[in-house]
């Protein structure tokens, strides 16, 4: 588990489990978590790591409704949690099935997942939301369906960093599941906007050239 400082006050936290990458953006008044981890225990570890960097009040954005990105939320206590409505609905109504599937697939996870309360996001990202963290405005954007119907990306314009969730994966091909819309996904990757550093939901941070190559790979799969 390691912190990567991508720019002033912008961090990615890399985890060996599932090659997961979480994010943290600091302002002068509050901080933003980008996803919260795979389960309550993982979330608690993430919360402790964040508190080693900052005591600022936190809010979270969930990039999409898959369990490995949001089941850590309960560890942070009451806090504002942003997501697209489709992701919030998936979290509310689909997490039990996801947990059952992964507990059967990887039984070592079953107990930890069973002890992880589901926290449904309470703030909506329909198109664009600007969050003022104090001295820095972060943009939450829904650019259309892709990896899931409710993907949200997080742009930190002053730092040239974009958190892409599972719209981008490094170290493995993009995960095209039954809830993916590949044709729309290709278009979404073309609309990410300028960013020097793109942080995938799994894997190490990449550049725009990597994103373009992955976009071409997806286009070939349509």
Spell out what each predicted region is.
Residues 28, 40-86, 194-196:
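Active-site metal-binding motif and surrounding structural segment of the metallo-beta-lactamase
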Residues 15-17, 124, 144-149:
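A short catalytic or substrate-binding loop motif that flags glycine-/basic-rich loops and adjacent residues
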Residues 9, 25, 35, 50, ...:
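Divalent metal-coordination and catalytic microenvironments
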Residues 3-49, 152-166:
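Conserved beta-strand hairpin/beta-sheet module of binuclear metal-dependent hydrolase folds
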Residues 5, 31-32, 36-40, 89-215:
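Metallo-beta-lactamase
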Residues 45-47, 73-75, 94-95, 176, ...:
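Short amphipathic alpha-helical segments
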């Amino acid at each position: 588990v390691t912190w990567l400082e991508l720019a002033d006050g912008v961090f990615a936290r890399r985890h060996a489990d599932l090659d997961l990458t979480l994010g943290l953006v600091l302002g002068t008044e509050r901080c933003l978590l980008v996803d919260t981890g795979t389960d309550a225990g993982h979330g608690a570890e993430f919360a402790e790591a964040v508190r080693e960097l900052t005591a600022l009040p936190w809010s979270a954005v969930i990039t999409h409704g898959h369990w490995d990105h949001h089941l850590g939320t309960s560890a942070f206590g009451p806090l504002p949690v942003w997501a697209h409505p489709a992701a919030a609905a998936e979290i509310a109504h689909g997490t039990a099935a996801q947990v059952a599937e992964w507990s059967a697939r990887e039984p070592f996870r079953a107990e930890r997942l069973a002890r992880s309360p589901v926290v449904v996001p309470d703030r909506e990202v329909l198109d664009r939301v600007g969050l003022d963290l104090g001295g820095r405005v972060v943009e939450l954007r829904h650019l259309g369906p892709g990896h899931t119907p409710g993907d949200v990306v997080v742009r930190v314009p002053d730092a040239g960093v974009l958190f892409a969730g599972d719209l981008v994966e490094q170290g493995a091909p993009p995960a095209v599941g039954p809830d993916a819309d590949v044709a729309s996904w290709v278009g979404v990757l073309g609309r990410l906007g300028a960013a020097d550093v793109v942080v995938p939901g799994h894997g190490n941070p990449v550049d725009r050239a990597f994103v373009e190559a992955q976009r071409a790979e997806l286009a070939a799969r349509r």
